[in-house]
Design a protein with these regions (language model features):
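Cytosolic, long alpha-helical scaffolding segments
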Residues: 1-96
Length: 96
């Protein structure tokens, strides 16, 4: 991705985007199939997303460049989506 003449790899958001898509799909599948174990797995997956966010925050605070900032911003939105998958999973567990 090119931003203001700089080439950005957006490595953290690229890495986590696949996990977040898996979480969203998994939470929907858990709901449709009334699958508590799948719901629990979604909750566990969130730890990886959160840890990646903390790592990216640490790196962005030290590098302060446009690419790190953009990667962090996208990652924060992805982390929020992952949190919604966790909320769905938690409701499934309570419902069943």
């Amino acid at each position: 991705t090119r931003i203001s003449g700089a080439s950005c790899d957006l490595r953290y958001s690229s890495m986590i985007s696949k996990r977040v898509v898996e979480m969203v799909r998994g939470s929907i599948e858990a709901f449709l199939n009334r699958d508590k174990s799948r719901a629990r797995a979604i909750i566990e997956m969130d730890r990886e997303v959160d840890q990646t966010l903390f790592t990216a925050l640490d790196e962005a605070s030290r590098s302060a460049n446009i690419c790190s900032t953009l990667d962090l911003l996208i990652l924060m939105y992805l982390e929020r989506i992952a949190d919604h998958s966790v909320y769905i999973a938690q409701e499934i567990i309570e419902m069943l």
